[in-house]
Amino acid sequence: MRNVFWRQIRLLLVVFIGYLFHVTVMTQLDTTVSINLPLVILSVVIVGYPRYKAFWGGAVYGILLETMVPGVKLLNLVFYPICAMLMSLFFTDKSAARLQYDMSNHRRGRNRSVYLRTPLCALCATLLYEAVSIIYIAMSSAELTSAFFTRALTDALMTTLTAVVLMWPLRRLLGFGAPVSKAMAKG
């Protein structure tokens, strides 16, 4: 019980420290695009925790970014929880019942590597965020140029690379050990 409590406290700290780094450190970097640090942390949470905690993390980021960071009205408040739930459909661990069902239907009944799913989750979430942003720009009657799409792809790649770098320390901080291989589990 005590371990579960401290794991929740660590999750809360990671979410809030990630928000603080996003609004302080990431805005000071001298780059043309901003790395979306909340999506990096959400991708680690989505892969490591159940769906309701992914929604909780997305809701916290949505509320904080909506109230503290000026931008498109209600975009962050709506986007982050929906994105967390949508990405959790594809990137969370399969339940034991789902694994058993897959194996009974002669399919591959196993989860993919967390070290593959985390960057893919960050990439998909960032591409979704950039697509929503580009659609909003197009709806506001602005002319879309190739610079918008170049920045969107650059942001997606930089966010994915940041997820690759930060997933190991974040997983250790959140209390996830290295995945156990089948050979180690048997022996």
Question: For each of these PLM feature ranges, what is it?
Answer:
Residues M1-G187:
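Terminal, non-globular segments
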